């Protein structure tokens, strides 16, 4: 059995050609065995020698991984991107994968490529096509970050003050299955939620996924910030972030900062910093003559003194509860922060300024404040609604908080109900199929009963049944008028032939046939018995107007969903084909019937 076939790179093919030229007396079969390739492959390589050497010179370093001359669908974009990448690397500056993707998106926007998304798959193929490889140090850092992490255990119930422990603090014990509805009676603009998150301010989120030039160094504790975010339920008020870190206060001083900053040895929000923050909030609410509720999560509340709070009531989430701001708001803030870092890094790379790649504490605080302001109030209100609170102006909270376990139980109950409904629908569908089968058998032996002879009970069942996607039979009947577009026009042209639309069941005939057609069928039965037998075997075919009206409803249903241009184009092509085929078949059917009557 010969060697297994494999696709060689241009660099490997070039080495084979070089080996043949350096050893002219060596048999070709021996060279093929030396490189573990079939003799036919060697012959093909030597035949295309000139093209292979030209491709190796063209791709340079990329020839070590490039195997074909097949161009990427974004060849022009990649050409500009690799030229930019080589220019930056020649200056000795590192280019990370996320920066490369952001630059590709900018180039695509300039070229008008709206379908380009700079996905991770494209980035991987781009690297292989152009020989951009990952460094070993970066790969090790990626492996560390990809390792599964054990989720942190929830805070001990003992750390949460119990109800009635003094001050304006309200606590919930872990043993309580249903937490009290402390937010009930408050307007949505008077219900605030605060949560604390960590931010590695001098690193991109995918630091380990950089390209050659990244050092993959471990993160330092001094580069981590703790950020406290606080907003109300309708998103109309976003309090300035409280940021804590290990580094001393910036030289600009607290007055020149866009948010409050505090430094301590642990780098977290301490009890003293939180008490000062709440005192300032209480003073502000007193000036506005408001009483608000603040729902807190992972805060330093073990020894928090709230006796001086008069206009702020503090309550704590029970263990295992997903806080409103952690349902997407925190992720948005980090995303906006990353975008600001990307813009700064790209400006430094294009200006070939290595010092611009470093981010100072003062600039990081400005980025945090800008990222917080970039969050839309509607997104904050949506997260509160998802957490079980009302959202929107002047809304009153009437629902209680739900833990993760309770939400999972509710989702399981809903899934069980949906499964039960699905089983009932399947049973009903099987019964309808059996009834339809019986109707077909009866249709072969005798005429189908008229609609007026149907029992009243069956009529009620048919009225109650709806189509598979919630479309009633009456909606289908109105398709000629309501669907719009070209199908509506075609259906209107045949409205006289199909005044009312009905579904065709089993062996039922179409009720839209006119009385003249019934008279013609009776005349055919009297004139020719053979024609009667043939007509009895014919499957009822909807008229042209009926077909157009049916598809008009299908089109209206499909276009009721958000669809892209490609799907819209498919629907338009299908419309054109259906009109053409239906007209052709309708004309052919009319001609066949005319010939039958003449005979």
UniProtKB/Swiss-Prot annotation:
- Any idea which residues the entry calls the DNA-binding region? 28-48, 97-129
Q: Does the keyword Iron apply?
A: no
Q: What is this protein called?
A: Major centromere autoantigen B
- Looking at the record, which segments are called Homodimerization? 536-599
Positions modified as N,N-dimethylglycine?
2
Task: List the source organism.
Answer: Homo sapiens (Human)
Coarse class of the protein's main subcellular location: nucleus
Q: Which residues carry this modification: N-methylglycine?
A: 2
Record PTM: Poly-ADP-ribosylated by PARP1. N-terminally methylated by METTL11A/NTM1. Alpha-N-methylation is stimulated in response to extracellular stimuli, including increased cell density and heat shock, and seems to facilitate binding to CENP-B boxes. Chromatin-bound CENP-B is primarily trimethylated.
Q: Where is the composition biased (Low complexity)?
A: 144-159
What is the protein's quaternary organization? Antiparallel homodimer. Interacts with CENPT. Identified in a centromere complex containing histones H2A, H2B and H4, and at least CENPA, CENPB, CENPC, CENPT, CENPN, HJURP, SUPT16H, SSRP1 and RSF1.
Q: What does this protein do?
A: Interacts with centromeric heterochromatin in chromosomes and binds to a specific 17 bp subset of alphoid satellite DNA, called the CENP-B box. May organize arrays of centromere satellite DNA into a higher-order structure which then directs centromere formation and kinetochore assembly in mammalian chromosomes.
């Amino acid at each position: 059995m010969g060697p297994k076939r494999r696709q060689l790179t241009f660099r490997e093919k070039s080495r084979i050609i070089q080996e043949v030229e350096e050893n002219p007396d060596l048999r070709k079969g021996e060279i093929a065995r030396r490189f573990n390739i079939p003799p036919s492959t060697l012959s093909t390589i030597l035949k295309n020698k000139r093209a292979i050497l030209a491709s190796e010179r063209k791709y340079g370093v990329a020839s070590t991984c490039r195997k074909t001359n097949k161009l990427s669908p974004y060849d022009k974009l990649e050409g500009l991107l690799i030229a930019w990448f080589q220019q930056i690397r020649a200056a000795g500056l590192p280019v990370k994968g996320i920066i490369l993707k952001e630059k590709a998106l900018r180039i695509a926007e300039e070229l008008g490529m709206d379908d380009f998304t700079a996905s991770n798959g494209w980035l991987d193929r781009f690297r292989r096509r152009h020989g951009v490889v990952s460094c070993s140090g970066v790969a090790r850092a990626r492996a560390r970050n990809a390792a599964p992490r054990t989720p942190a255990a929830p805070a001990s119930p003992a750390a949460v003050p119990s109800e009635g422990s003094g001050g304006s603090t309200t606590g919930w014990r872990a043993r309580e299955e249903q937490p009290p509805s402390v937010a009930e009676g408050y307007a949505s603009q008077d219900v605030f939620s605060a949560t604390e998150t960590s931010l590695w301010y001098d690193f991109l989120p995918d630091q380990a996924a950089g390209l050659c030039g990244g050092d993959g160094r471990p993160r330092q504790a001094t580069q981590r910030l703790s950020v406290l975010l606080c907003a109300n339920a309708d998103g109309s008020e976003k309090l300035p972030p409280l940021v804590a870190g290990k580094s001393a206060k910036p030289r600009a001083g607290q007055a020149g900062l866009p948010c409050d900053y505090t430094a301590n040895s642990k780098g977290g929000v301490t009890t003293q910093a939180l008490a000062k923050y709440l005192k300032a909030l209480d003073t502000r609410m007193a000036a506005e003559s408001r009483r608000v509720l603040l729902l807190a999560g992972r805060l330093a509340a073990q020894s928090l003194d709230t006796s001086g709070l008069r206009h702020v009531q503090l309550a704590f989430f029970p263990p295992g509860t997903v806080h409103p701001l952690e349902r997407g708001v925190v992720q948005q803030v980090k995303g906006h922060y990353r975008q600001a870092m990307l813009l700064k890094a790209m400006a430094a790379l294009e200006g070939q300024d290595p010092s611009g790649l470093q981010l100072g504490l003062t600039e990081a605080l400005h980025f945090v404040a800008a990222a917080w302001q970039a969050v839309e109030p509607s997104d904050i209100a949506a997260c509160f609604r998802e957490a079980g609170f009302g959202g929107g102006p002047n809304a009153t909270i009437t629902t209680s908080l739900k833990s993760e376990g309770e939400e999972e139980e509710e989702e399981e109950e809903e899934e069980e109900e949906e499964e039960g409904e699905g089983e009932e629908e399947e049973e009903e569908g099987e019964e309808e199929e059996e009834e339809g089968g019986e109707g077909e058998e009866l249709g072969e032996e005798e005429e189908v009963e008229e609609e007026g002879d149907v029992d009243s009970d069956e009529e009620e069942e048919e009225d109650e049944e709806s189509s598979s996607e919630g479309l009633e039979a009456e909606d289908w009947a109105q398709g000629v008028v309501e669907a719009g577009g070209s199908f509506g026009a075609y259906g209107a042209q045949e409205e006289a032939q199909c005044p009312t639309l009905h579904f065709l069941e089993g062996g039922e005939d179409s009720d839209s046939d006119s009385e003249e057609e019934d008279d013609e069928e009776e005349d055919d039965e009297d004139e020719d018995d053979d024609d009667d037998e043939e007509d009895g075997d014919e499957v009822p075919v909807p008229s042209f107007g009926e077909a157009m009206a049916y598809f008009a409803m299908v089109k209206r249903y499909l276009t009721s969903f958000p669809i892209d241009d490609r799907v819209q184009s498919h629907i338009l092509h299908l419309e054109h084909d259906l009109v053409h085929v239906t007209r052709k078949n309708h004309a052919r059917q009319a001609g066949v019937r005319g010939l039958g009557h003449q005979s």
